[in-house]
Amino acid sequence: MAKVLVIAEHDGAKLNAGTAKVLACAGALGAQAIDVLVCGTDGSGLDTVCGQAAALAGVSRVLKNARAENAAPLAAVLAPQIADIAAGYDHVLGPSTTFGKDLLPRVAGLLCAPAVSDIMTVLGPRQFERPIYAGNAILTVTVPDGSKVVGTVRVASYKAVGEQAPAPVEAVSANAALPTHTRFVELRAGAKDRPDLQSASKVVSGGRGVGSGENFRLIFELADKLGAAAGASRAAVDAGFVPNDMQVGQTGKVVAPELYVAVGISGAIQHLAGIKDAGTIVAVNKDADAPIFEVADIGLVADLFEAVPALVKALP
């Protein structure tokens, strides 16, 4: 039976929700053991993150890799360490997020192993399904015998695992030469009190129909009323209404909330590819022929400038 190493994503204080979904994928492998590797520096909240990982169902051990060079999650610095620690494992998995997509291919290269991206279904220990062509086709990938399996997991395809009695936390170290050509400069992030877009259970997104960046206050007001994250279509981002970290879709962020509200979004194929795993989709658009209504569970043909304020007022 396989041994799986899951790479935890965190911000130094809190474990990213995607890690719990990667564990669900790892569990589908029927593994003998599933260990979670947490990289960071001592005194930066690393112990808290390790505790959060240890409490997730299915975790056998949490491996704490603390060193000063891990103060920032630089893929070039983390990859050699992970490749060394992964020596005794059959599978190395991480989330298919910006972090995971940057890190895991490097790990695969160092291990001379195939890299499988966007795993959405486990068919067997070495066989997986992944989406292609904006999710319109599913590709079956088989990893040859004799090599490790290194992959990123499409977190939108899995539900987070539950909790368990805490697993043991063990300190580990890597015998790896670290590169010096990459250095951390600074982290800039916009201040926001809303949930993370990719892990939120509710998302409200606006499209080009919103008309302007100023009008996006309507999207933010509705999102805040619902306790939801705020997103946008590519058209709204390209028009400069909002920053590109809000983009939902094939070329943006793939989301799988329980509730997705699309306001003024026509429903381009690349946007629909990013919300295909959403639970309930609600669409508000004045164009009754908009493609978004073909996938919506609830559709409201109305002027968003009248409908959204009315919804905000009606919500408790």
Residue ranges and their predicted role:
Residues 1-316:
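N-terminal glycine-rich FAD/FM-binding segment characteristic of electron-transfer flavoproteins
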